[in-house]
């Protein structure tokens, strides 16, 4: 087969959506809706740019470059290896994978209890099941695309349908002070926190494996199908974010002052369906977290198997699942203190790599733009994210530094310098 059918392409898109859509993606839109109130839709536009547009652009950029290693290698081959390892570890066993179990258990706890033994037993079953599903990374479509993602979407539609039929308020409420003006920018900043753009750089390889497992062998067709799957996943993210955000805006109007998106969803589910609503919400969280966990275990295991082919993929997948289980129960808080600053340092670099990749022939015409732009950005983002004393204070004092965008000016300087300078020719 040289081309995917529409149905199979849709399944691949469902698979990618389910890998993206974790607990944070559930929590952020209703929280945004509750806080933005009558300014929800302008804020949603900003959220769509940073939480949907950037991740989809990341999938497209990696597919066009034929892999993250080639994309990051435009800076330097050594940079590519270090960057990839840091990303895989940060969004994998050092942060995102352990949090899938701890977050989903937190939503189950009101129903089953909060004992340490219960959490340990849950996490063992959770990661064992995720490991078994991830054992065949090229067949994730069978589980995520065909079964688990449709189940998740049906449950979300039930919750949203209840909100449509029995809204908690007749109209949106008053916005919080930060959304009174500049709601679009606030939405961009809020969507920026999902950090799905980093995940997008990693998911492309697994999606390509699943496309090839459908019988597609031509590299051009794999690339095209990956890009189309990215747009399918982006469309689903946009629709689900809109539903959750609208529900959050009405819930926030009915019950002002809710602290988090999880609180918003809990109030919504409880008022619509009572205890059955809390069971529904817990099922949504467990499914969303499980899907993301499977995708991340597959991505991290496949990458390290590629680095060390002598170690089989199941060994890496099992190791990362077991390590994540231990971290989620024993040392998650300590790991978060280390991994979150690393993620904050990596994120601007990832955004710039994606943006630069869409400039035609940039690498050929101005080969220094990539290393200088990424180098300047990395210096600022590392100094801003890590406690480096006066250097950190200087990095945060740059324009837009107060809102986490202090890297914009160094990136612009790097781009300008890269366009003006020429590499020194090597002596024969």
Predicted segments, located by residue:
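Hydrophobic, membrane-embedded alpha-helices of multi-pass small-molecule transporters
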Residues: 11-21, 162-169, 177-244, 280-289, ...
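Hydrophobic alpha-helical segments and their helix-loop junctions in multi-pass secondary transporters
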Residues: 93, 97, 153-179, 197-198, ...
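C-terminal membrane-solvent junction of multi-pass transporters and transport-like membrane proteins
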Residues: 351-416, 423, 427-428
């Amino acid at each position: 087969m040289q081309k995917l059918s529409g149905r199979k392409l849709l399944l691949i898109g469902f698979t990618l959506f389910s890998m993206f859509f974790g607990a944070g993606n559930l929590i952020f839109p209703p929280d945004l809706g509750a806080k933005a109130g009558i300014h929800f839709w302008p804020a949603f536009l900003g959220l769509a740019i940073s939480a949907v547009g950037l991740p989809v652009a990341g999938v497209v950029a990696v597919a066009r470059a034929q892999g993250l290693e080639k994309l990051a290698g435009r800076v330097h081959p050594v940079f590519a290896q270090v960057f990839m390892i840091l990303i895989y570890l940060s969004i994998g066993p050092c942060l995102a994978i352990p949090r899938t179990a701890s977050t989903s258990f937190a939503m189950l706890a009101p129903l089953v209890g909060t004992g340490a033994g219960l959490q340990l037993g849950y996490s063992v079953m959770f990661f064992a099941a995720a490991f078994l599903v991830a054992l065949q990374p090229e067949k994730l479509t069978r589980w995520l695309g065909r079964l688990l993602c449709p189940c998740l979407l049906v449950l979300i539609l039930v919750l949203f349908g209840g909100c449509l039929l029995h809204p908690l308020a007749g109209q949106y409420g008053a916005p919080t002070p930060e959304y009174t003006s500049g709601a679009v920018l606030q939405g961009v900043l809020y969507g920026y926190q999902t950090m799905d753009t980093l995940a997008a750089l990693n998911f492309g390889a697994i999606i390509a494996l699943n496309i090839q497992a459908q019988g597609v062998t031509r590299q051009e067709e794999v690339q095209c199908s990956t890009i189309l799957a990215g747009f399918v996943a982006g469309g689903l993210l946009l629709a689900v974010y809109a539903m959750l955000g609208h529900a959050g805006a009405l819930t926030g109007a009915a019950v002002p002052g809710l602290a988090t998106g999880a609180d918003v969803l809990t109030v919504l589910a409880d008022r619509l369906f009572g205890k059955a609503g809390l069971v529904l919400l817990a099922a949504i969280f467990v499914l969303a977290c499980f899907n993301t966990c499977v995708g991340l275990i597959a991505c991290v295991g496949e990458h390290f198997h590629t680095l060390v082919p002598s170690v089989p993929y199941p060994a890496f997948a099992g190791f990362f699942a077991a390590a994540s289980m231990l971290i989620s129960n024993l040392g998650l808080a300590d790991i978060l203190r280390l991994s979150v600053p690393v993620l904050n340092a990596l994120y601007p670099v990832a955004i710039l790599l994606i943006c630069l990749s869409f400039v035609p022939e940039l690498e050929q015409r101005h080969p220094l733009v990539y290393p200088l732009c990424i180098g300047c950005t990395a210096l600022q983002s590392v100094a801003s994210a890590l406690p480096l004393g006066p250097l950190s204070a200087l990095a945060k004092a740059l324009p837009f530094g107060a809102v986490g965008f202090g890297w914009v000016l160094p990136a612009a300087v790097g781009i300008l310098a890269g366009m003006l300078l020429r590499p020194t020719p090597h002596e024969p």
